[in-house]
Amino acid sequence: MARYIGPKCKLARREGTDLFLKSGVRAIESKCNIEAAPGIHGQRRGRQSDYGTQLREKQKVRRIYGVLERQFSGYYKEAAGKKGATGENLLQLLECRLDNVVYRMGFGSTRAESRQLVSHKSISVNGQTVNVPSYQVRAGDVVAVREKAKNQLRIVQALDLCAQRGRVEWVEVDTEKKSGVFKNVPARSDLSADINESLIVELYSK
């Protein structure tokens, strides 16, 4: 399945919420009418079955983190095999992706831009170049922008934007050095309350 490259607003309208696919320079409401579904009948959102609700939640989370269907299924299987709550394990695996950590540290204005930085070998982990967006970052790992990319305007702008919106507590960043530490894997209480991971567990448990 190919990665979606179409209008970001369409995805946000489909899920009826901000998926954080845009930089956040302007409020999402000023760009997308997220209250209305896409299409000619977008003003009307029909009633959903339990399955439909579960599927929409899975699609929402998958799109937030920019993960393809097969990857997402793999993460779920890995999460189910771990000790603890499967839903929480799933979200933690997604949060530990290198592209997501780069985004959380503020080196990219969106997860898509952060994924591109990783793919273009602009990011290092513990001093070693890593170009795999799905690489799992561990507590204590040092994630940094490589010297060759430090002066990129988009990275400077992304850091400014992150300073405005605030940085999550589980990363510590030196903006001058463009380097950060992934202090710990976030607990469920640290993550978005707008995600109902139990619906995803119910979907995969069918």
UniProtKB/Swiss-Prot annotation:
PROSITE patterns, per database record: RIBOSOMAL_S4, S4
Pfam entry (one): Ribosomal_S4
Which InterPro entries does the record associate with it?
Ribosomal_uS4, Ribosomal_uS4_bac-type, Ribosomal_uS4_CS, Ribosomal_uS4_N, S4_RNA-bd, S4_RNA-bd_sf
Gene Ontology terms for molecular function: rRNA binding; structural constituent of ribosome
Its keywords, alphabetically, are:
Ribonucleoprotein, Ribosomal protein, RNA-binding, rRNA-binding
Q: Per the record's keyword annotation, is Lyase included, yes or no?
A: no
Subunit annotation? Part of the 30S ribosomal subunit. Contacts protein S5. The interaction surface between S4 and S5 is involved in control of translational fidelity.
Q: Could you tell me which residue ranges the S4 RNA-binding domain spans?
A: 96-156
Q: Which GO terms describe its biological process?
A: ribosomal small subunit biogenesis; translation
**Family, as annotated:** Belongs to the universal ribosomal protein uS4 family.
How is this protein named in the record?
A: Small ribosomal subunit protein uS4
What the protein does comes down to: One of the primary rRNA binding proteins, it binds directly to 16S rRNA where it nucleates assembly of the body of the 30S subunit. With S5 and S12 plays an important role in translational accuracy.
HAMAP family per record: Ribosomal_uS4_B
Source taxonomy lineage?
Answer: Bacteria, Pseudomonadati, Pseudomonadota, Gammaproteobacteria, Pseudomonadales
Superkingdom of origin organism: Bacteria
- Listed GO cellular component terms? small ribosomal subunit
> What gene name does this entry carry?
rpsD
